[in-house]
Amino acid sequence: MTKVLLSHPPRPASHNSSRAMVWVRKNLFSSWSNSLLTIGCIWLMWELIPPLLNWAFLQANWVGSTRADCTKAGACWVFIHERFGQFMYGLYPHDQRWRINLALLIGLVSIAPMFWKILPHRGRYIAAWAVIYPLIVWWLMYGGFFALERVETRQWGGLTLTLIIASVGIAGALPWGILLALGRRSHMPIVRILSVIFIEFWRGVPLITVLFMSSVMLPLFMAEGTSIDKLIRALVGVILFQSAYVAEVVRGGLQALPKGQYEAAESLALGYWKTQGLVILPQALKLVIPGLVNTIIALFKDTSLVIIIGLFDLFSSVQQATVDPAWLGMSTEGYVFAALIYWIFCFSMSRYSQYLEKRFNTGRTPH
């Protein structure tokens, strides 16, 4: 019996290294200009990153309670640790801050079921949540009844106030902006003209002017002895201002839909509101998810303008802490911390927007 010996060729070496070299050559050194730009970026990172790491981590001061404890040449993160409560809660009484934490916990727990795919009556649940949860938050934070000590809104501040203004602003501006977008495309001249006037007026006025008018000028036109809380006036101004931008974003989605969608709804004998609610708006809102999230991110960052009317959000609380004589010279650490918080929230919203785009396949336009 003859034995046949089969010789197997050696396995080819891994192509990972060669693929990496091809990618580097194609994307970083494909031309002289690209090579110079790559080398310049490498040099810039070499010059900036090591000193930054040295300042932020290696030579940073982490332990202590006063400015005198910051003896190293790096960042004084002791300042952030000692003023963290002010950055998060503003001037809210220290012994009452558990109320804010409880409101946040209730919000997180109650929002979680909205992401369940098997949640029955999802629409009713969201509608009930939108009505009940703000009342719970107001009761917990403001108090004044049911054995809770009253805490005036002038004591609210920090990241808490930033989140309140941003969330209430977009929650109020979204439905109002949708109505304005529908009104601007209405066949009724009066409705269309009024919608156009409202949108163009608020789009032509800076937000800082709106806040100033709501806080300083509005009380001059009110009856003597009548007063409205400063935070309420600011929230109303933010909602009116932001609704104009939401309206234009939604109008872009409405214009992107082909006429066939309207004709299909008419063939089913659907009325105007059923057509908009069941056929048009779901598709239009799906198309403008990036624009809506961009508007939300812009509003979140614009909350820092409330300092003009004496409200101290996150950024204003950091500024207030840096002028404290006990912590002079800590402005860099404070602004870096504030920038990091803003970046975390804005980046998270941006990533969630990308998730929604992929989930709803916003790249496809209905035919």
Swiss-Prot record:
Superkingdom in the source lineage: Bacteria
Gene Ontology MF terms: transmembrane transporter activity
Database matches in Pfam families: BPD_transp_1 (PF00528)
Transmembrane segments: 37-57, 100-120, 126-146, 163-183, 193-213, 234-254, 292-312, 327-347
One BP term from GO: peptide transport
Name recorded for this polypeptide: Inner membrane amino-acid ABC transporter permease protein YhdY
Residues in ABC transmembrane type-1 domain copies: 159-353
CDD domains: TM_PBP2
Subcellular location field: Cell inner membrane
Ranges facing Cytoplasmic side: 1-36, 121-125, 184-192, 255-291, 348-367
Family: Belongs to the binding-protein-dependent transport system permease family. HisMQ subfamily.
GO cellular component terms listed in the entry, alphabetical order: ATP-binding cassette (ABC) transporter complex, substrate-binding subunit-containing; membrane; plasma membrane
The encoding gene: yhdY
UniProt entry keywords in alphabetical sequence: Amino-acid transport, Cell inner membrane, Cell membrane, Membrane, Transmembrane, Transmembrane helix, Transport
Function according to Swiss-Prot or TrEMBL: Probably part of the binding-protein-dependent transport system YdhWXYZ for an amino acid; probably responsible for the translocation of the substrate across the membrane.
Its membrane topology: Multi-pass membrane protein
PROSITE patterns: ABC_TM1
Periplasmic-side positions: 58-99, 147-162, 214-233, 313-326
